[in-house]
Design a protein with these regions (language model features):
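C-terminal ends and interior cores of transmembrane alpha-helices
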Residues: 46-58
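Intracellular juxtamembrane helix-capping segments at the cytosolic ends
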Residues: 76-89
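Short amphipathic helix-loop junctions that connect adjacent transmembrane helices
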Residues: 1-7
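Interfacial helix-cap and linker-helix signal at transmembrane-aqueous boundaries
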Residues: 30-31, 115-124
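Symmetry-related core transmembrane helices of the 12-TM Major Facilitator Superfamily/SLC fold
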Residues: 128-146
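Cytoplasmic membrane-interface "Motif A"-like loop-to-helix N-cap segments
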Residues: 33-44
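Short hydrophobic/small-residue motifs within alpha-helical transmembrane segments
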Residues: 17-18, 106-108
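Paired small-residue
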Residues: 50, 61-69
Length: 155
């Protein structure tokens, strides 16, 4: 806890949302140039690096930079998933697959803040949560990288 006022802290959540909106739109052009799978690998890695920036944040400006960076990366991943699922599994399966993926994400979004608060209450720090996020991002990046060996259309 860095002693940031509640209203300012809530503003950081808005910055995550703003970054996410930008990431959802901006990734299209990048994915068209480099391919969807390389783009999602890049964005998964970017998200992990954003978590590292969060770990080192010492004030509001650094947290704001993290919020925008994380939002951009997260928004890009969210927007790429439907297209990659369509490329890999076709139209017949995409609805069920996306429903499963986004339901899993919803549980994470619902339970994550409670888990982070619980960890903070026990350890007095968010560091274990942040390092957990870094580890999960590394796993997601590695899993996404495995798709590079598959023949998935660029668009």
């Amino acid at each position: 806890d860095l002693g940031i006022a509640d209203a300012s802290a809530v503003g950081l959540v808005g910055l995550i949302g703003a970054g996410s909106v930008f990431g959802r739109f901006a990734i299209g052009g990048l994915a068209d140039r480099m391919g969807r799978v390389p783009a999602i690998v890049l964005m998964q890695a970017s998200m992990g690096l954003a978590f590292l920036a969060w770990q080192g944040a010492g004030g509001y400006a650094a947290l704001a930079a993290f919020a925008l960076w994380f939002g951009l990366s997260y928004g890009a991943v969210v927007s790429l998933m439907p297209a990659i699922c369509m490329d890999m599994f076709g139209a017949r399966a995409v609805s069920a697959i996306l429903g499963t993926l986004y339901t899993g994400a919803a549980f994470g979004n619902l339970l994550g803040p409670f888990a982070a608060g619980w960890v903070f209450d026990r350890h007095g720090s968010y560091a274990p949560v942040i390092w957990g996020c870094v580890a999960l991002s590394a796993i997601a990046t590695a899993a996404s990288s495995m798709l590079l060996a598959r023949r998935v259309p660029a668009y």
